[in-house]
Amino acid sequence: MPIKLIQVQRKLNVGINTVVEFLHRNGFSVEDNPNTRISDEQYALLVKEFGKDLPEKDRNFAADRMRKEVPSVKEEKTAEIKTVIPEEFRPKIVMKGHIDLDGGQHKKQQEEPKAKEEPKVKEEPKVKEEPKVKEAPAAPAAQAPVKPAQPAQAPTEKKEEKVIVVEVEKEKTVEKQPVVAEPKVESVKPEQEVEKTEEKDDNLFRLNSVKLESKIKVTGKIDLDALNQSTRPKKKTKEEKRKERDEKQKFNNNRPGNNSNGPGAPHKSPNSPTLIKPNAPAKPGEEGDAKKKRKRIKKDRVDVNNTPGTNYPRPNRDDRPNNDRKPRLKKPVKAEVSEEDVQKQIKETLARLTNKNNKNNKGAKYRRDKRDAAVKREHELMEQEELESKVLKLTEFVTANDLANMMDVSVTEVIGTCMSIGLMVSINQRLDAETINIVAEEFGYKTEYVSADVVEAINADEEDDNEEDWVARPPIVTVMGHVDHGKTSLLDNIRSANVIAGEAGGITQHIGAYNVKLQNGRRITFLDTPGHEAFTAMRARGAKVTDIAIIIVAADDNVMPQTIEAINHASAAGVPIVFAINKIDKPHANPEKIKEELANMNYLVEDWGGKYQSQEISAKKGIGVEELLEKVLLEADLLDLKANPKKRAVGSIIESSLDKGRGYVSTILVENGTLKMGDIVLAGTHQGRIKAMFNERNQRVEKAGPSEPVLILGLNGAPQAGDTFNVLETEQEAREIANRREQLQRELGLRTQKMLTLDDIGRRIAVGNFQELNVIVKGDVDGSVEALSDSLIRLSTEEIQVNVIHKAVGQISESDVVLAAASNAIIIGFQVRPSLQARRNAEKEGVEIRLYSIIYDAIEEVKSAMEGMLSPEIKEEITAYVEVQQVFKITKVGTVAGCMVKEGKIKRTNKIRLIRDGIVIYAGELGSLKRFKDDAKEVVAGLDCGLNITNFNDIQVGDMIEAYEETEIKKTL
């Protein structure tokens, strides 16, 4: 008979995996599952292998099982041999043949182990008892087949006799009176033996009895009738069924009596209202067992349906005949009423009420329609405003900061979005239309350009471009690099070879762009912008100002942050890069290290198998400069740069400033066309006729062709660096467009002004010590003003906000002082001075004017001023760990702890924390610190001390005390 792996594991005391592996080795495929059943043959193999610790009878039984299973085809012969033995003991059949097994099998199974413990000689007189008839054979049943093989001991023979008797009895009970039916007996007998072996297993596993029945039905095909006959007595019991029917009738008859006239029920219900309710109808019935079972089931059903905690009403509800109607009484779930339905209902009700009172219905209807129309118009207006709030009305060039204000988002988010699309922008950098569209769309806004007509007017004025007129133009090269890496030295070296000796230096330092003629007759325009900001701004607008970038790195230094930033700007703009490794004449120069650092940034130079050209140079000694210029020209040839010199000039503003003697001066770079004296130029919001032009050597020139930088006089203001300039036909047209742009810029300025909202006030309150620093920036050139404003705005923190309320080119005027006094601002002048009247007004109004020549000094001073406005930061430093080793209770003092300093040094003035099991129990101050009987200022590690804690006495042995100091640190930005 199959047996589960879990049972085999328990019997043999080995793991399931071991059993499965062993069976696999012996050619059996068994699933690794505790509930997998194995055959007797497999079980016998396992017993043979692992059953050394098993009792001898179990091992023999397993072997016998295997023997039995092998000749399973010859069942009849084995059965014939065994049926001969029991016939000697027929006298006992008469006593036990009439036994009917009761329905309560659980009791029998529970009593089995007890029966087996008793001496088996005493069981003969107690054969009549129902449970023990089955139990007595159960234990020795397994030995019946075993003993013929080894009949050695006397006590075992007695057991054999009993076993045989019971086997015969069972055969007889199955057959009832079959004298001739020997084949049935033969076939039943092996099954009975299987039954008994299974019963033996029941010593440990009670549930096997259920499996027993199911397996008997499955295994024996011929004996199903016999098995059904044997099991039938348990189910039939006609007398019990008849009695139950009678009791049901009696109970139903007595039911109404219990509610109305029953004297028993009312007496019992007050005594125990909940428990005796089911027992009340129990009196009329004589047999209580069957009745109790039925009522128990009913009681459970009542308890499930009824809510707990009710007292007397329960029996009445329980006894009602119409209990089935309860679910029908459930109320239907009401549908939720929407706000619109409510409003509609109210309107209809009001309309009915007003109609009753108003006899003149026409007038009321007219007024009602008028009201409805007004409400409808209001709704439409609100919807229109909501739509318009998502539309940004702006000019083509808007700074990142203004765009952020219009969309009511942080400027860092706008810059982050630009970086994600490959654009490096700064706070005050102006964005082109395409970039604005992408950024606005990212934040869910639509754009509407109010300056479209202005752009169209300029575009309409442009001339047609013929490809036949195109000629090669010199490349525009920007030199970029970290401070002190030799950028200026390289430019001076390149320029000194081509500049007349008497004209070196001078104004060329301010122009920032110049044209160099090489020995081979070719020209290169070098651009020396004040910072990489302007370069990026020009690239962002798509104006191809720079064609090639030279990145200078010092060989005795590293690739510095500003160098990395410059490389990123050039890469984002898609400009070819040539690396110049400078200062190779120095003793500590290591060009290979620079190449390695560039390779780590994924910029492989040609020496290392990459695509970027590099040249080792010494700018001071002129080593390698010619080779560098050759490589630059090679890159230019690959780009195939061309322009049309026959059309009107278009270009970019490099720098602008206010010169006291000459007025507003602008350095421009012509990209296409030719600029001539007397041309009408429009640049941003400024326009004017060119009065004079100077080249980088401060010599007057009459015209400037493509890729030529010149300094022009004649504009009515200082245009912003990076603005595009156009040459127009008439001055009137230029003035109209400039005025229109100025108007749009003012409107944009008003739109971007942000009033203080409740959210801002709440945020400031949350920060606590919020400060504002208003600044007015004046400088000599527009590039410096932009760079300084940008740097100051970047200093803003959560606690201090820097606002640049005004910035301009030129000296500090009286109007600047008035504005500063009104807005409580400070004036920062960069390489400019205040006028005499402005200085007097500033002293009178108490306005602070700070003047600087170096941009870094200005930034550092503003930074230190801001740091002075910050509240200091409190830093905590742990000074000692102390372990409590003893605790003393002292009256009027409290709990004193005897401690050992484990680490550091504890001072009398330290603040402390008491830590128990890693959790801070208390934080406070020391009440006293003593060493022996003397007060101590401090105790170092390894010494013991006594201490008590102010207002805390719950100190325990084993607690850790952590001593710490708080120091105020000046906050930095």
From Swiss-Prot:
GTP binds at residues 481-488, 528-532, 582-585. Residues 97-343, 353-372 are annotated as: Disordered. It comes from Parabacteroides distasonis (strain ATCC 8503 / DSM 20701 / CIP 104284 / JCM 5825 / NCTC 11152). GO terms for molecular function: GTP binding; GTPase activity; translation initiation factor activity. Pfam families: EF-G_D2 (PF22042), GTP_EFTU (PF00009), GTP_EFTU_D2 (PF03144), IF-2 (PF11987), IF2_N (PF04760). InterPro entries: EF-G-like_DII, EFTu-like_2, IF2_II, IF2_N, P-loop_NTPase, Small_GTP-bd, T_Tr_GTP-bd_dom, TF_IF2_bacterial-like. The keyword GTP-binding applies. Residues 481-488 are annotated as: G1. Its main location: cytoplasm. Residues 136-155, 252-266 have a biased composition (Low complexity). Keywords: Cytoplasm, GTP-binding, Initiation factor, Nucleotide-binding, Protein biosynthesis. This is Translation initiation factor IF-2. Residues 506-510 are annotated as: G2. SUPFAM superfamilies: Initiation factor IF2/eIF5b, domain 3, P-loop containing nucleoside triphosphate hydrolases, Translation proteins. Residues 472-642 form the tr-type G domain. Residues 582-585 are annotated as: G4. It is found in: Cytoplasm. One of the essential components for the initiation of protein synthesis. Protects formylmethionyl-tRNA from spontaneous hydrolysis and promotes its binding to the 30S ribosomal subunits. Also involved in the hydrolysis of GTP during the formation of the 70S ribosomal complex. Residues 618-620 are annotated as: G5.
